[in-house]
Amino acid sequence: TQAVKETYGKMLFYEDKPIEAFYFSTSCGRTADAGVWGTDSGKYPYLRAVEVKEGGKSLGKEDNDGFESYIKREDVIAYDTSYPMFRWQTDLPADVASAQISGAGQIQDMTVTDRGPGGIAGELTVTGTDGTVTIKGQSAIRSALGNPSLIITKKDGGTMTGSATLPSAFIAIEKRTGEDGSLSFHIYGGGFGHGVGMSQNGAQGMAKTGKGYKQILDFFYNGTELRECNEG
């Protein structure tokens, strides 16, 4: 593509140091900061939690009510809105969750008890017949709640299966009881990937609105400078 040609042989720098240019597939309309990996986000000031739309407002931590109402909406305006994984849903049977989350016994409930900037799940508390288990970090939460048998229904109605982890940790969880008394957890989700840095489909969406590569890179890696490799 033209952007690839124009950036060939160049690197992004922040205060004279090459950056960690993290990227992922699709956003939920928001990004996360480097704190999702337990890292001090202050070490990566160019990796911010922002709204992935015109203006790119910076985001702080959010409570469950605010984020849950956001992630359940499919009409959110964002650069990624038109992509199927912008919103997705799945059902996790309690017996499947109980088999792969050790220490809780037969699971009776689960709640997101901490969210990072942008609303990404950072801590999940699981309650069962044997006690309470706390799962921390977006990667661990995605692994705990994912299973290859789950059917992920995308925004466009398409489905995917076979993934051992959830597509992202931008999630809201709703406990449901079936007519037969079986317990399950309905998961509303958005985006695909860890959510830090540049959304590839968000960048595509920006390009479609006429944004150039410099604008796109500055949006996702704020305050950085693109230089020839030999300038560093």
Please tell me what each predicted stretch does.
Residues 1-232:
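Conserved, single-site charged/polar hotspot
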